[in-house]
Amino acid sequence: MEKKEIKVTRGELYMADLPEETVGSVQAGKRPVLVTQSNWLNEKSPTFLAAIVTSKLKKTRMGTHVVLPQIPGLPKRSMVEAEQRYAVDKAQIIRYIDKVDDSVMKEVTRALHRSEESDEVTKNRRHSHYRRKKMELGQTGN
């Protein structure tokens, strides 16, 4: 692949050509990706970290998924899968699509944190959520 002098920015969507050699649920081929890496690192590196964007809206309430508003350049309503991240070489970029707004990027950042948090943090967050729900329903006990 030829080296491209492309400046990518956190929050930008690109169509990228990802390697086809994958197994299981790992995404591959020509597909949209969202730049998640910090801008200072994007400037210094020929690669960047990106989350997969898919038009298959499954498990939309999963804490690592963020449904995007309708975006020009994406043929269908799509979703970011924060748990599916890649190191993408800038030479793999096919074209620029668009940039998501700050409120969407905040949701994506939360989803990225959830995908990387420890099991203990996840367990505590879930326990707190269920305890709150029980209180709302007027139930007591554990």
What is the predicted role of each segment?
Residues 19-23:
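Short, charged beta-turn/beta-strand-edge "cap" motif at the junction between a beta-strand
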Residues 2, 6, 70-142:
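C-terminal terminal-subdomain/extension
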Residues 25-30, 34-70:
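Compact nucleic-acid interaction/catalytic patches
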